[in-house]
Amino acid sequence: MSLFDLKRAERRRRRVRLKLRSLSSIRLSVFKSNRHFYAQLIDDEAGRTVAAASTLESEVLAVASRRVNAGAVKIVAKLLAERISGLDAAYRKFVFDRGSYRYMGVVAAFADELRSLGFEF
């Protein structure tokens, strides 16, 4: 990525986070690289991560290829849903923090899978 692209991504990330701060104290943050995808449910009031899942886990590594794709991301969404469902009902409603990533591709596939599993955001 060029320096211009990095600056534009940083501005987009800050803009998204600023808007999310006013909405809710519980957010689902995602990070993706070329090889892996990470998602974590963060309680900003308590300052801690409530639940997390990624493509580094053995259930996903057995199925996924060397690069992150929609199939692997759907498995990560199911793992995260299992971990959240065991928690308090307040954690079923949160805001989706896509960071600097556009809502397309694996980010959109992850969000759609979570919505189909009954989460509201």
Curated annotation (Swiss-Prot):
GO CC term, one of those recorded: cytosolic large ribosomal subunit
What family does this chain come from, according to its entry? Answer: Belongs to the universal ribosomal protein uL18 family.
* A GO molecular-function descriptor: structural constituent of ribosome
Its GO biological process terms? translation
What CDD domains does this protein map onto? Ribosomal_L18_L5e (cd00432)
Q: What is this protein called?
A: Large ribosomal subunit protein uL18
Q: How does it assemble?
A: Part of the 50S ribosomal subunit; part of the 5S rRNA/L5/L18/L25 subcomplex. Contacts the 5S and 23S rRNAs.
* Pfam families for this protein: Ribosomal_L18p
Biological role stated in the UniProt entry: This is one of the proteins that bind and probably mediate the attachment of the 5S RNA into the large ribosomal subunit, where it forms part of the central protuberance.
Lineage, top-rank taxon, reads Bacteria
